[in-house]
């Protein structure tokens, strides 16, 4: 509301960017990783296939989230959650999102591996439980989502560094959404 002026415009977009990233990406995906681990290791009564990979993914997600938040809070990456080109953010903004996504991908791979371990060790009989099936569906969707994000965020990172001179904003919007 322009007449209310709760925040100045620059602080509004800073808060909106941080809120969008933290609530729509960080919180939801950390929760999804927890669901994947629960649906595989706990519900199936199996061990995690690669605990070190799972912890590595967690720390990468945490590092990426922290890096992106610092870039936003420094004030040079208030591009809102969608971060549309041609609005340029700090390279650390894009690098943080990429690291976060790689960490999530490691978590998804650990989930798939845990399903294989559970099947090999016969920790369950018949088909997988419904909750685990739902988590499997979410994990498959996550792989495709992360791949689409990489397709557009890696060139955007290179553009923000200056290694690529132009990114088509329409292509960015189509791939992002």
Can you say where each PLM-predicted feature lies in the sequence?
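Membrane-embedded and interfacial regions of multi-pass energy-transducing membrane proteins
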Residues: 1-177
